[in-house]
Amino acid sequence: MRDALNTGLIDFLKASPTPFHATASLAQRLEAAGYQRLDERDSWATVPGGRYYVTRNDSSIIAIKLGKQAPLLNGIRMVGAHTDSPCLRVKPQPELQRQGFLQLGVEVYGGALLAPWFDRDLSLAGRVTYRRDGKVESQLIDFKLPIAIIPNLAIHLNRTANEGWAINPQNELPPILAQVAGDERIDFRALLTEQLAREHELIADVVLDYELSFYDTQDAALIGLHGDFIAGARLDNLLSCYAGLQALLAADSDETCVLVCNDHEEVGSCSACGADGPMLEQTLQRLLPDGDSYVRTVQRSLMVSADNAHGVHPNYADKHDGNHGPKLNAGPVIKVNNNQRYATNSETAGFFRHLCMAEEVPVQSFVVRSDMGCGSTIGPITASHLGVRTVDIGLPTFAMHSIRELCGSHDLAHLVKVLTAFYRSRELP
């Protein structure tokens, strides 16, 4: 099971260079398992035991496995994650031609570690909107090949490089794509028109707009002397999306189960398809007959917010509280913050710990050092919007928000096992 899950995760990461591609990959896997797509613009005719999914903005997805009994009786088991990761996104008018090189201006998306983006073989993917035969359409593209790089400045020209330096995103991050003649002018949108023709065999009249991200072309891989680790891009938080999907597909539950994977978590979740928007609430309201049933059902439900946790790094162990240093390959982490940066409380933490003990899955705890600030997740946002009880958990990770992150190769199986048990649980606290 562990090897198959790890291989599946690596394949999923490769197919998901952007939130758009991640959502499409999740939808493809759901459809292969018999899930039916629901269109938010249509009326829904769902049936007990039915399997459905809905997307918004092509970058967020909610999968629903309706129970044979009404959700009002035993509540809904929900797992939440997010599809986005920090990256470099192309600006609307990006062409830069400097010193005979074609470069693209980029904007930093989210709280990225910037130094690891240098000297990497980069490709470009995302969503393109165009006009064809008088109609406005959109399509996903992925160049796949390494078409760009951000070369470092040689240490001979920057003698203090190893003493730390502040990276200027405006000046130092535009990737180089090609050499060009002095009088040659490159139209980036024309390049996108060519890519649409290559990848999808369609001829666009004009590219109207796009949302494109650079990404590292190096595939995720099992690494380490004994294969103890998985190294790859976007583990935060496609790792949790994949674990939630596998648990949902494996759970033969009579209860109603939901997996929600939101976009825009890395930039605050405040969007129509983010956790701070109405997507999940509106979806649940459409599944329940009236307002009274909705409130009662939510109060009988529970959300597991799954997002990567900071593993204790052997070179920087002092960055953790001495009693709360999550270790890689030692199981999922319950995340606690009394200032509500995480939504965990004693009841939800106790229930998750109970599930882990019942499944013989190791479990850990994390609380940030008292002299450091704490990050957050979709957990508190979802809890405050729905009023649903929530526990924040995640798998220990190194180099979070780097272009290449690291997690334990045993932990995915641990997380899938306990999330499957959660979906199967007959009673919630």
UniProtKB/Swiss-Prot annotation:
- Which Enzyme Commission number(s) are on file for it? 3.4.11.-
- Highest taxon, organism lineage: Bacteria
Q: Which residues bind Zn(2+)?
A: 82, 156, 401
- GO MF assignments: aminopeptidase activity; metallopeptidase activity; zinc ion binding
Q: Can you list the GO cellular component terms from the UniProt entry?
A: cytoplasm
The Gene Ontology biological process annotation of the record reads: proteolysis
Q: Which HAMAP family match?
A: Aminopeptidase_M18_2 (MF_00467)
Alphabetically list the UniProt keywords: Aminopeptidase, Hydrolase, Metal-binding, Metalloprotease, Protease, Zinc
Q: What class of enzyme is it?
A: hydrolase
What the record says about family reads:
Belongs to the peptidase M18 family.
Indicate yes or no for the key word Protease: yes
Cofactor(s) this protein cannot do without: Zn(2+)
What is this protein identified as? Probable M18 family aminopeptidase 2
Question: Where do the TM regions start and end?
Answer: none
